[in-house]
């Protein structure tokens, strides 16, 4: 359980946890999101401590069919755009009408937000709407983008989901907005960004676990595998390695 709580933040907090202070004992693992300074501090201190990931700007990819309400899709895109001017919101749809209507709705809704400055900057610089002939064509793009958040706002989301290989978290169906995942749905929303979902997963208890291998040989077992170890060590030019095995074989 939790036995210490410290109210600290920023890159200096990451340094304090990694190296320790006169009041804070150094830790082994640092996890969780933060701003660009926190992300860079975690990157630089990886090796001194373990980290979960280096999280970048937030991302959302929405795959939507023509049956969606454009205003709702626009709201989903802006839910990430309002985070930061460097956030990215992408829509892939098979409906040209939806694409046009969503583009118009984004402009109207963004202008009314208290987070307008960040949302408009994000959408203008990083917002993308892509039209495809068939929603099946969206899957290779989604796997290539490996987005932090992937919304499948389609009639049969399970069919597309079965072909998704790379995404931080997937939200199935028109009634599953990404914002619910941020706050109350259950799965952790500390997720890989910047296409890192190709090789990493969201924060979980596994980030606080590790494995230790162990080996035990008896004399008979060493007699079987030892000569191969000797040969490999000699080929690698490491005679002391070979000798540590050979002496046991000759004993």
Predicted feature locations:
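Gly/Ser/Thr-rich active-site loops/lids in small-molecule metabolic enzymes
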Residues: 53-59, 85-92, 96-104, 115, ...
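Oxyanion/phosphate-interacting regions
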Residues: 49, 104, 251
């Amino acid at each position: 359980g939790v036995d210490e709580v410290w109210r600290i933040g920023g890159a200096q907090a990451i340094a304090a946890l990694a190296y320790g202070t006169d009041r804070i004992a150094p830790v082994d693992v640092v996890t969780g999101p933060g701003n660009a300074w926190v992300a860079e501090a975690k990157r630089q201190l990886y090796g001194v401590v373990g980290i979960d990931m280096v999280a970048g700007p937030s991302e959302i990819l929405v795959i939507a069919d023509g049956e969606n309400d454009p205003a709702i899709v626009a709201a989903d895109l802006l839910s990430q755009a309002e985070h930061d001017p460097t956030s990215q919101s992408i829509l892939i749809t098979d409906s040209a009408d939806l694409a046009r209507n969503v583009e118009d709705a984004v402009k109207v809704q963004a202008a009314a937000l208290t987070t307008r400055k960040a949302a408009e900057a994000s959408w203008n610089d990083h917002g993308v709407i892509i039209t495809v002939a068939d929603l099946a064509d969206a899957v290779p793009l989604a796997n290539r983008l490996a987005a932090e958040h992937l919304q499948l706002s389609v009639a049969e989301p399970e069919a597309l989901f079965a072909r998704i290989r790379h995404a931080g978290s997937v939200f199935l169906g028109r009634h599953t907005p990404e914002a619910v995942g941020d706050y109350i749905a259950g799965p952790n929303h500390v997720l890989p960004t910047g296409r890192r979902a190709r090789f990493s997963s969201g924060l979980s208890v596994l980030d606080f676990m590790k494995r230790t291998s162990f080996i035990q040989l008896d004399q008979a077992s060493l007699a079987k595998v030892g000569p191969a170890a000797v040969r490999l060590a000699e080929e690698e030019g490491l005679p002391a390695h070979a000798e540590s095995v050979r002496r046991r074989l000759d004993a």
